[in-house]
Regions:
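Rossmann-fold scaffold of SDR-type NAD(P)-dependent oxidoreductases
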Residues: 14, 85-93
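Conserved glycine-rich cofactor-binding loop
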Residues: 17-18
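N-terminal Rossmann-fold NAD(P) dinucleotide-binding loop
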Residues: 21-22
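Aromatic pocket-lining residues of Rossmann-like dinucleotide-binding sites
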Residues: 28
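Conserved glycine-rich Rossmann-like NAD(P)H-binding loop of the short-chain dehydrogenase/reductase
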Residues: 33-47
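A conserved hydrophobic alpha-helix of the Rossmann-fold in NAD(P)-dependent oxidoreductases
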Residues: 45, 71-78
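The beta1-alpha1 cofactor-binding region of Rossmann-like NAD(H)/NADP(H)-dependent oxidoreductases
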Residues: 63-73
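Conserved mid-core segment of classical short-chain dehydrogenase/reductases
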Residues: 72, 95-104
Length: 104
């Protein structure tokens, strides 16, 4: 018998409103992982929140990952119960990551 860890995990997913990001969010919700869903389209974030919020706790962040200032502001705005992030899915389509790791 496999025993699953009972502590709730939290995942932050960029580019969560479509494609791989949306599929990952759905899978994680089905695995009882709380979600921080990030995207540029608020209406899509709202749809996901309505669909997956029945399964797990969800917090949405509407911003563009290409702006470091917007990223910092969004992460700083997280409620206390979402500040500990266990899993990061850096999926946003335009997050090229061209800067060196120490400055990115």
């Amino acid at each position: 018998m496999i025993l699953r860890e009972t502590t709730m995990k939290t995942a932050l997913i960029t580019g969560a409103t479509s494609g791989i990001g949306r599929a990952t969010a759905t899978r994680f919700a089905n695995e009882n992982i709380n979600l921080i869903l990030c995207g540029r389209r608020q209406e899509e974030l709202d749809t996901l929140n309505n669909e997956l919020g029945k399964l797990v706790k969800i917090h949405t962040l509407n911003f563009d990952v290409r702006s470091n200032e917007h990223v910092q502001k969004a992460i700083s705005s997280l409620p206390e119960d979402f500040k500990h992030i266990d899993i990061l899915i850096n999926n946003a389509g335009n997050a090229h990551g061209l800067d060196p790791i120490q400055t990115g």
